[in-house]
């Protein structure tokens, strides 16, 4: 199953060779493909004619060419060039990391600038007030129409206002970490980058970090090289608040991933996914056969399964923390974060964002398991029959079975729980159920008929060095039970 209709950016085999001086032989086809799928590189060569651009690329090394490359061509974002990342406290591609982690750069708060860098004439910095419905709507508009780089994309994320509230106003959120750029004359919001505070564990080292998200630039300003300026500005604001590390994800290659996971997709409404171009019809199969293959039971099978309630927060918090401690990179949840991220509050939330369920033992009434998923719709662009795809994303889950040290029992339990999650998502009118190869997901993805996507999600740490952790896939990029235990954090 493909994350995009065509596999843009897949490198032609046997056409790349690196010279001894680090430069690369670039064929015209490779140059065109690299520019098409690499917004950062495209902006670096903006204004050059084709020959000059090709010549500039020939002088680059592999690291420079790859920085900012999206192998799937989907949801491309300009994440800045290799030259910029060379100036940042991030691990280099060519360095050898050890398990013993630590900050790359010690920040002296006295030396952090109290003022932001100047923007291009005609633009100014803004701090977004997401408690203000007008400003929330402005951010929604920017993300809705400009979060996808490829003008030919078939799908565009549609973040609801409820989703933005949920994602950006978590416990401890700071208004100054919701950064915008406005056009001075029109006051129009033309760029954003946002962060929320949390704590993570990196190989048992607890770090206060900012989760960075929603880096978005208006399409008409993509050549203005705003990305590095946005990253530097939110970094400055975090430093001023005493936070010197960050975690972020990207579908593009940057220096240097701490882990990489693969997307998997389980059709819930196969026919609709086929009609919008998301799911292909396999050779030799029929529509009827695919619908039958992806059919799900109408009722769940786990005894004691019910929606999570506020009374479950303490028990779920304890279970989740113990479960996540099994992973090298994980989120250190507080009770307040469990409440915020997992409990739907219908009295205050216009549109449901998260669904969470617990398993209460019918005899002991103890909570033995829980799972959750969240809603992220996509707008379908120029399709005569459908205008949206409702996607459920597997979020956090945990089970007491994980502590039995019985892998067979854990696999059986997760197969039951996740099959029920699929059934419940189908009942909630979702069209597809998405998951990554993190947590213990490799134990059930293939058996529950998840199809492999062509997209990767790379995890990055800013100003922190540690050896890479496994992302649940082997050297063939397939789910592998032996490659679990690395990523225990889900980024929106």
UniProtKB/Swiss-Prot annotation:
Keyword Repeat: no
Gene Ontology molecular function: glycylpeptide N-tetradecanoyltransferase activity
Compositional bias segments (type: Basic and acidic residues): 1-22
Enzymatic reactions: N-terminal glycyl-[protein] + tetradecanoyl-CoA = N-tetradecanoylglycyl-[protein] + CoA + H(+)
Keyword Nuclease tagged: no
SUPFAM superfamilies xref list: Acyl-CoA N-acyltransferases (Nat) (SSF55729)
Cellular location(s): Cytoplasm
One GO CC term, this protein: cytosol
Recorded superkingdom: Eukaryota
Keyword annotations: Acyltransferase, Cytoplasm, Transferase
Enzyme Commission number(s) of this protein: 2.3.1.97
Residues at the catalytic site: 492 (proton acceptor)
Main location as per UniProt: cytoplasm
GO biological process: one example: protein localization to membrane
Enzyme class: transferase
Binding site for tetradecanoyl-CoA: 82-85, 215-217, 223-227
Family classification: Belongs to the NMT family.
Name of this protein: Glycylpeptide N-tetradecanoyltransferase
